[in-house]
């Protein structure tokens, strides 16, 4: 699960492996299984979830696109040179903030429905993010 992937990322001494684990945790938390076009969708959803102002949304979006590129270069090309301690720490913090927001949502949903499952909460989160991303694209805060 997402928390396990995040925890495993915290335990890594290899920067690239930690980076990959954090990215996987984000994908597992915010994307449907076997989703195509993960990079853009993940960047959109993380920025919608964490950004407050238009500028913050754009900054988080660009950072996530860069992080995903670094992960791909490391995983597919064997080139992890862009992954530094700073980038790893930044992605760790992004992942932690996303997980915290999702846990808060779980607690809120559980208050009104004690039988709700993580899969159901995840679907609610993803549905809300689809709506939010559409609004942000329409306002120009995210690229269309």
Model-found features: residue ranges?
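Amphipathic, oligomerization/interface secondary-structure segments
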Residues: 1-144
């Amino acid at each position: 699960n997402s928390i396990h992937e995040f925890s495993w990322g915290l335990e890594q001494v290899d920067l690239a492996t930690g980076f990959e684990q954090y990215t996987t945790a984000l994908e597992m938390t915010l994307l449907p299984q076997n989703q195509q076009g993960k990079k853009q969708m993940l960047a959109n959803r993380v920025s919608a979830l964490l950004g407050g102002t238009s500028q913050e949304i754009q900054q988080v979006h660009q950072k996530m696109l860069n992080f995903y590129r670094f992960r791909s270069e490391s995983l597919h090309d064997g080139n992890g040179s862009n992954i530094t301690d700073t980038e790893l720490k930044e992605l760790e913090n992004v992942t932690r903030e996303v997980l915290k927001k999702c846990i808060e949502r779980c607690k809120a949903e559980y208050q009104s429905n004690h039988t709700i499952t993580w899969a159901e909460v995840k679907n609610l989160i993803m549905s809300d993010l689809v709506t939010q991303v559409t609004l942000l694209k329409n306002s120009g805060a995210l690229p269309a």
